[in-house]
């Protein structure tokens, strides 16, 4: 879920923090990608006939197709991704995960009813609600991107939190995810719609956390408390408090403790055993690996390894795969050349400026006339 209605609240109160940019505008940038979110999106992006891509034996390959082509698109545009996968979910997320399981069970019943009625549109809708990324699919995705030479990290806990930690440490420019809680975890920049299909021609939606805090008139602690009131994966919401009310309460009372002391708890009943302090701690002190000494290395793709995996094992079209890998390698070379050209152009500018300064100094000396240490000729 991320944080309920946070995108709307930011749109209402901090429109300047949102920029729509072209994909190619991130040339030369390193980004941390919430891989688990990507896989989910690839799996729900079913074909027009409502089915997922599969091998002849019935194995789903939508996740591999999506990961392969989205990665190539990024590399082709000079973007260097790091894929971060979810680790063990925090204990406080158990309730949310149980709710998701219940929703999938209900969706399965509704899907079966729709099948009996021959309602194809409803069948497709409920099929998407049944999607869950399996451990095997995650491992296959890791294998693929590793063969492609892309760094892979297994987060101790939440992938978005680890992405945010990488961004805060300056290892990457931004977090790539559709989950808004990447901002709540402190990612300075969040990029949404970056992994959308190229055919959709959607701009990348860039969100700037510092601008959000400035426009909201809040510090990070207050922003986290706002996100908890809006609704997150760790605790229930307070019935009757929607996005507008939540924003007003934090603006006025600054923290959840003050809100609870002030509001009418008959009108706004507090959930039993509401562990908002623990939720706050999970956002402000998430379980992440230390990024300070972490070295991210992008390697040459293992072309034959990729062909073996995708074409031999997963029945992908070899000509298309090899053609795409050629495009990827050209993209890598272009990015490297651009960085070299950039280096020399900067050096040229510096040299030019130095020469210009020396010439100006010579001209100034001529204008001043003879130096003080010499006698002027009569």
UniProtKB/Swiss-Prot annotation:
Belongs to the XPG/RAD2 endonuclease family. FEN1 subfamily. This is Flap endonuclease 1. SUPFAM superfamilies: 5' to 3' exonuclease, C-terminal subdomain, PIN domain-like. DNA binds at residues 47, 70, 158, 231, 233. Mg(2+) 2 binds at residues 179, 181, 233. Interacts with PCNA. Three molecules of FEN1 bind to one PCNA trimer with each molecule binding to one PCNA monomer. PCNA stimulates the nuclease activity without altering cleavage specificity. It comes from Brugia malayi. Mg(2+) 1 binds at residues 34, 86, 158, 160. It is found in: Nucleus, Nucleolus; Nucleus, Nucleoplasm; Mitochondrion. Residues 95-113, 354-364 have a biased composition (Basic and acidic residues).
